[in-house]
C-alpha cells in the first residue's frame, strides 16, 4: 500500500503521474480517496491512508539544525509524518533549507503559505492556512523516515 500527501514537489518529479498511471503493482490509497463521492467515506479513507505501508510527501522547510517542518490547513497531509505510516519518504528541493528552526517557520509563514493560499484558492475556491504544524527533530525508529534532498528547486 502506498499513499501520499498533496505536494507540489511530488507533481514536479512526476510521482503523482506514475502513481495514477497504474503501471506498477502498488495499491494506491490516494486514488481510492479521490474516487469516493461521499465526504464521510472520503474522511474514513483519508484516516486509513495515513497508516499506509509507504507514505510519500514533502516538507515546507528544512533547518540546517536538522529539523524538518511541514504544515497544512487540516493536518491530512502531515498526519502520517510523526508516526502513522510504516515508512515515510519525503522529497524536498534544496531551496527549502534555512539557517535555523526560527527561519524555517518564518519561511513557511511568509513565503510558502501565501503561495499555497493562492493555489488552494484557485484549485478549491477557498484559501489555506497554517493550521497544523509537524516538526520532525529526529526519528527514533531505524530506517522509517527517508528524506530525498534534491539539489534543485522543487515545490515552494
Describe every region a protein language model picked out.
Residues 48-156:
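Conserved phosphate- and dinucleotide-binding cores of soluble alpha/beta proteins
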